[in-house]
UniProtKB/Swiss-Prot annotation:
Keyword Transferase applies: yes
A molecular function (GO) term: methionyl-tRNA formyltransferase activity
Biological role stated in the UniProt entry: Attaches a formyl group to the free amino group of methionyl-tRNA(fMet). The formyl group appears to play a dual role in the initiator identity of N-formylmethionyl-tRNA by promoting its recognition by IF2 and preventing the misappropriation of this tRNA by the elongation apparatus.
Protein source organism: Coprothermobacter proteolyticus (strain ATCC 35245 / DSM 5265 / OCM 4 / BT)
Name of encoding gene: fmt
Annotated family: Belongs to the Fmt family.
Record-listed E.C. numbers: 2.1.2.9
Residues binding (6S)-5,6,7,8-tetrahydrofolate: 107-110
Reaction(s) the record says it catalyses: L-methionyl-tRNA(fMet) + (6R)-10-formyltetrahydrofolate = N-formyl-L-methionyl-tRNA(fMet) + (6S)-5,6,7,8-tetrahydrofolate + H(+)
Record-linked InterPro entries: Fmt, Formyl_trans_C, Formyl_transf_N, Formyl_transf_N_sf, Formyl_transferase-like_C_sf, Met-tRNA-FMT_C, Met-tRNA-FMT_N
Disulfide bonds: none
UniProt name for this protein: Methionyl-tRNA formyltransferase
Length: 304
């Protein structure tokens, strides 16, 4: 099958690799190289890096205008897959009968429409999420549903552990999609239920408010497990990557920590947390036991 694969982020990488393994003829359409890192050097998108390694043809774009549209329809694609792309898809593309265009969205639509569904589902304390394959529409993530599958969110799941589960389900749903398309059984149905939106995290949302309940802070840390939820210790930035609800009595004021043996506990607005993994500015990421060994003060305040 000849596939146009529209992607600029990381979520679609395992799907791209699996499609290549299954010997589909793929062309990657991705964003042009963008400045990144300390030196702001031009860097290719993550899919472009993978595609180059797999010898997949790459088309880099900064918009999808007339020249691109003409090229696109001249290629004889059977299917167009859109996942974590970052550009508006023109109506000429998504309304065409061929190639059939499908968008992979990692939520149970209509819940968590928008660019950040995985983090938002975790941060909201959801017990389940999923993957939905939809038609592209003029309004973001409002297209009819081809296929949908639920995925349980385990209590210990965070962004790092949940994302691969959703990527695996995405590929399994695509296989079903290809089969139904081949058999002429592909159908789509309207989204039902109350919609919600999943915007990107604002800079303020990356910081921990220790006045919030322990459960809410735990969910925030789980949602930011790859980048770390921010706080401070004195003048130093601290990123927290993993916590759990502590069995300690509510004796610690919000933000106040105490180090006991190899454990680190911190008070919140309701309950307390045990910090398991963190990184202080200028140091490597550490488990709590290693961090505690280097602490001069066994009691203090985060975010103070």
């Amino acid at each position: 099958m000849k596939i146009a694969f529209f992607s600029s982020g990381t979520f679609g990488l395992p799907v791209l690799e699996e499609l290549k393994k299954e010997n589909h003829e793929i062309v990657l359409i991705t964003k042009v190289d963008a400045p990144s890192g300390r030196g702001l050097k031009l860097q290719p998108s993550p899919p472009a890096v993978v595609a180059e390694a797999l010898q997949i043809p790459i088309v880099k774009v900064n918009s999808l205008k007339n020249d691109f549209i003409e090229w696109y329809f001249s290629q004889g694609f059977d299917v167009a897959i859109v996942v974590d792309f970052g550009f508006y898809i023109p109506k000429q593309l998504f309304q065409a009968d061929k190639p059939v265009m499908v968008n992979i969205h990692p939520s149970l639509l209509p819940k968590y429409r928008g660019p950040n569904p995985i983090r938002r589902a975790i941060c909201s304390g959801e017990l389940e999420t999923g993957v939905t394959l939809i038609k592209i529409s003029e309004k973001m993530d409002e297209g009819d549903i081809y296929l949908q599958e639920r995925v349980l969110i385990d209590p210990d799941d965070d962004y790092v552990s949940l994302t691969p589960k959703l990527q695996h389900v995405s590929m399994e749903l695509l296989k079903k999609f290809f089969l139904e398309l081949k058999q002429g059984n592909l159908r789509a149905f309207p989204q039902l239920g109350d919609p919600s939106y999943a915007p990107k995290f604002t800079p303020d949302e990356l910081w921990i408010d220790w006045q919030k309940p322990a459960h809410d802070i735990q969910n925030q840390v789980r949602a930011l497990a790859d980048v770390g939820a921010k706080t401070t210790l004195g003048s130093k930035l601290v990123k927290i990557f993993k916590v759990r609800i502590s069995g300690m009595e509510d004796s610690l004021p919000p933000g106040h920590y105490v180090a006991e043996k190899e454990s680190l506990y911190v008070g919140t607005g309701q309950g307390s947390l045990e910090i398991l993994s963190l990184q202080q500015e200028g140091r490597k990421k550490q488990d709590a036991a290693s961090f505690v060994k280097g602490l001069r003060e066994k009691e203090g305040v985060f975010g103070g």
